[in-house]
Amino acid sequence: MQNRNKNNWMKKWVIRSISILIILNIIAWPSISYAYPIFAQQSYENPREATGRIVCANCHLAKKPVDIEVPQSVFPNTVFEAVVKIPYDKQIKQVLGNGKKGGINVGAVLILPEGFELAPYNRIPAEMKDKIGDLALFQNYRPDKRNIIVIGPVPGKAYSEIVFPLISPDPATNKEVHFLKYPIYLGGNRGRGQIYPDGSKSNNTIYNASIAGKVTKILRREKGGYEITIEDTLEGRRVVDIVPPGPELIISEGEFIKIDQPLTNNPNLGGFGQGDTEIVLQNPLRIQGLLLFFVSVIMAQILLVLKKKQFEKVQLAEMNL
């Protein structure tokens, strides 16, 4: 009887432990997955400033290329894809928040014309779904800004080329949309940023000396990183500069350094880039009219040739008489 009670107690304990772990994982996962885009979403009403600069560049200081491909034109209420390319060397590893090395992640923000938005899942063709991967990774910048879509951070090895499933608006149902050429803006990054929105540095950037003087002591901290004591012999003051785990020191004890002189290397291997393109919302009636015009031109050419041959036959008959 005691063994049975003990077994029942053990089963309950295991089930409760597993349940707690699952709940903790669910709570923690969104904060990890959506940590980077949420910085911009919380701090800026619109990710594109009046100058054309995308706000992600405030945290990602290095410049890297990005590319975007879209159809030249689309019809109303049509699903199409925008292919965003964020190239980087897949062999390199970045400094993580804990100072260790890990894989590089990527992220992107796509600013579409008003009315354009993410395509509903049931409208996306099967072959496009295979290219997209997990549609849940895409999210609107704000509930009221469905034309601005963000994704990331996601693993760079799987998503250095991101396919956005989009749908065009219909001027027949949306009177604010017209058959025009529209701009599309892209911002894309690979790797972690160098500055947080509050202005503080991450551990993925260079650390500089706060004063000029002699490095009198370098203490390795228990949880990683360094405490660097710099003594200003002229003013007789001493300052301790803290370097978090991640960057590597390039100075040594006894060395005389200048103010703002780098104490560490630059661990950043990523960067941010902007791009833009254009897309035409095409009127189907215009295409139909164009086709009718081409058909009429071809028919006119055919009739002209037939008329010419008929005229030549009449001339030949008159000559034979």
Curated annotation (Swiss-Prot):
Gene Ontology CC, one term: chloroplast thylakoid membrane
Alphabetical GO biological process terms: photosynthesis
Cofactor(s) required for function per UniProt: heme
Entry note: cofactor: Binds 1 heme group covalently.
Residues bound to heme: Y36, C56, C59, H60
UniProt keyword annotation of Plastid present: yes
Transmembrane segments annotated in the record for this chain: 287-306
InterPro entries: Cyt-f_TM (IPR024058), Cyt_f (IPR002325), Cyt_f_lg_dom (IPR024094), Cyt_f_lg_dom_sf (IPR036826), Rudment_hybrid_motif (IPR011054)
SUPFAM superfamilies hit by this protein: Cytochrome f subunit of the cytochrome b6f complex, transmembrane anchor, Cytochrome f, large domain, Rudiment single hybrid motif
Major location category of this protein: plastid
Compartment annotation: Plastid, Chloroplast thylakoid membrane
Membrane topology: Single-pass membrane protein
Assigned keywords, A-Z: Chloroplast, Electron transport, Heme, Iron, Membrane, Metal-binding, Photosynthesis, Plastid, Signal, Thylakoid, Transmembrane, Transmembrane helix, Transport
MF GO annotations: electron transfer activity; heme binding; iron ion binding
Signal peptide: 1-35
Family: Belongs to the cytochrome f family.
Quaternary assembly: The 4 large subunits of the cytochrome b6-f complex are cytochrome b6, subunit IV (17 kDa polypeptide, petD), cytochrome f and the Rieske protein, while the 4 small subunits are PetG, PetL, PetM and PetN. The complex functions as a dimer.
Function: Component of the cytochrome b6-f complex, which mediates electron transfer between photosystem II (PSII) and photosystem I (PSI), cyclic electron flow around PSI, and state transitions.
Protein name in the entry: Cytochrome f
Species name: Psilotum nudum
Organism classification: Eukaryota, Viridiplantae, Streptophyta, Embryophyta, Tracheophyta
